[in-house]
Every structure is written in structure tokens, then in C-alpha cells.
């Protein structure tokens, strides 16, 4: 029965805190998505939400292993949600996991996941007393993680810190390679953000749609596949709020301007640092060529 209220995005690809503060009296819960690994000023966000009595749930699908300051992503809000789907920081093909310090919320989550009345066997769950008030009023939606996926994931968790460092090495090579490209806007990252960059984004801000399509086609012809959030129809994983007909929203022109210019690229660990330098060089050449033609 909840009603969704969308909050805008800034040109550094994080939640617009001014817009959040303006809409703070319209909601009780903030589902905060650290999309593509970009973390906002979490100190300011939590101050806004605490003042308004808003519960924060963090979608950390792209920030597992990252930090804001000294706090791991997912530990600011009441709950952190992590994806284990393909291309995420740990990969079991599908599924995910939650972390939470609130016994009642976690008890509800365990029963929702499909524990039936076997919740007492959950070795990471809260005390058994936490289930008494919720066990008969919480439906079972069968979203359990099976032991096979858990066995696939546990060794990856031990390697997470090293994997995060390897992704960031690749990010910095690409970022440096795009540092002086006319018409291309890089994303500024604050010092407090200890990010994990398993993907790379840049902006072709205020470019005509046809020019952006031309850059994508030029790069693809040379083996570099880029994704564009500004396409009128959703493609692959790149959808926008105005595509979600199940969740209507009023227009957000400031966010629309940013979304129109976002270009997105995965940084797989199968790429060597030399590969990343080559990719950056191709993007730089094709963006510069299109910019000069326009």
C-alpha cells in the first residue's frame, strides 16, 4: 500500500540531497540505491533522514566492500541489501543477502524469505523471542538462499578486498585516460568515498541524442560496448524512472538532463590494465571526433 516518491539525481550520479530534504515529509522510508557504486554524502543524508524520522534502507548492489569515511556501505541505514547476481562484487548467478541489527526487522525478513516455522534453525538470525510477534502475521514468499549458492559465495567473500582493489586499479586507468577529452564530463568522487569501481560512468552532458548514438556506434565498431541511460526505451540494465509505468512520477527535469547524458561501461577483472588503457583511448578518440564534427 505504499506510495513511491522519487528523488532526483545530481551530476555526480548520487541522490540530490536538496530534493530529498524538500520531500522528506512525504515518506517514512528511503530506499537508497548506490547506483553503479556512487555513494552520496552519507553523513548529510542520515542527518536529513533522522530529523524527518525516515528509516533508511541501503541498496548496496554495486557498493559491497565500499565505504563512506570509515563506515562500510550498508551500515548507515537500518538494513543493507547486497546482490550476488552476475556482474556483482560476489557472484553466485542470482540471489543476494541482507544485514541488519534490528531483531524484529530481521525476524520478518527471515520468515518472508521462506523459513516457514523453521526459523529457529537460522544460525545467523536474531534470538527466538524476536519471531514470536511476527511469525503468524508475516507471509512466506520463498526467497531463500540455498546452500549451493552460499558455498559458491563464501570463498569469494574472503577475496573481496583484493578484488575491490583490482577493480579500482582498472577504474583509475580509464579515468586518467579520459581526463582531457573535450565534451566529456568525468564524475568527481569525494575524498570520503572509499568506492569500489566495478564499472565506469561519464557524461556527455547536453549532447544531442544523435551525437551520443554516433559515439556509441563508433566505439562498438572498435570493440568497446557502452550503455546509454538516455535512450528513449530501456535497454538491458539501463532503465529510467519514466520507463517504470508501474510507478508513476511527476517529471524531474534536472534529473532528466543528467540521465540523458549518462554513459555506462562495465570494468570486468578479465580486462588487464593495458586493456583498460586501450578502451579509454578508443572512447577518447571517438568522443573527440564526434565533438569536433558537431
Annotate each PLM feature.
Residues 45, 109, 215:
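Aromatic/hydrophobic pocket-lining residues that form π-stacking "cages" and hydrophobic walls in ligand
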Residues 11-92, 97-99, 103-105, 264:
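Active-site phosphate-binding strand-loop segment of PLP-dependent enzymes
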Residues 63-69, 76-199:
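Active-site region of PLP-dependent enzymes
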Residues 117-129, 173-176, 214-263, 293-294:
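Conserved PLP cofactor-binding pocket of PLP-dependent enzymes
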Residues 1-5:
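A short helix-loop-beta submotif of the ANL/AMP-binding
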Residues 31-33, 83, 152, 188, ...:
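Short beta-strand segments
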Residues 190, 197-208, 237-249, 259-273:
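Conserved PLP-binding active-site segment of the aspartate aminotransferase-like
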Residues 23, 44-52, 173-180, 218, ...:
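Alpha-helical structural signal in soluble globular domains
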Amino acid at each position: 500500500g505504499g506510495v513511491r516518491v522519487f528523488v532526483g539525481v545530481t551530476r555526480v550520479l548520487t541522490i540530490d540531497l536538496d530534493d530529498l530534504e524538500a520531500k522528506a515529509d512525504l515518506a517514512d522510508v528511503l530506499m537508497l540505491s548506490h547506483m553503479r557504486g556512487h555513494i552520496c554524502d552519507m553523513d548529510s543524508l542520515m542527518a536529513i533522514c533522522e530529523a524527518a524520522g525516515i528509516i533508511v534502507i541501503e541498496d548496496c548492489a554495486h557498493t559491497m566492500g565500499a565505504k563512506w569515511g570509515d563506515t562500510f556501505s550498508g551500515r548507515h541505514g537500518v538494513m543493507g541489501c547486497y546482490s550476488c547476481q552476475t556482474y556483482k562484487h560476489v557472484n553466485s548467478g542470482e540471489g543476494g543477502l541482507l544485514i541488519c541489527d534490528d531483531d524484529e526487522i530481521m525476524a520478518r525478513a527471515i520468515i518472508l524469505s521462506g523459513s516457514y516455522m523453521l526459523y529457529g534453525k537460522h544460525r545467523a538470525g536474531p534470538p527466538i523471542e524476536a519471531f514470536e510477534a511476527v511469525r503468524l502475521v508475516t507471509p512466506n514468499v520463498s526467497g531463500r538462499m540455498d546452500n549451493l549458492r552460499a558455498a559458491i559465495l563464501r570463498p569469494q567473500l574472503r577475496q573481496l578486498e583484493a578484488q575491490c582493489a583490482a577493480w579500482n586499479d582498472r577504474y583509475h586507468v580509464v579515468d586518467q585516460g579520459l581526463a582531457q577529452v573535450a565534451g566529456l564530463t568525468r564524475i568527481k568522487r569525494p575524498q570520503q568515498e572509499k568506492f569500489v569501481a566495478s564499472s565506469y560512468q561519464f557524461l556527455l552532458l547536453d549532447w544531442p541524442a544523435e551525437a551520443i548514438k554516433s559515439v556509441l556506434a563508433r566505439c562498438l565498431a572498435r570493440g568497446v560496448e557502452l550503455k546509454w541511460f538516455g535512450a528513449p526505451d530501456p535497454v538491458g540494465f539501463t532503465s529510467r524512472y519514466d520507463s517504470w509505468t508501474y510507478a508513476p512520477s511527476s517529471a524531474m527535469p534536472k534529473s532528466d538532463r543528467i540521465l540523458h547524458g549518462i554513459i555506462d561501461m562495465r570494468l570486468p577483472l578479465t580486462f588487464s590494465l593495458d586493456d583498460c588503457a586501450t578502451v579509454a583511448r578508443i572512447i577518447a578518440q571517438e568522443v573527440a571526433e564526434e565533438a569536433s564534427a558537431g
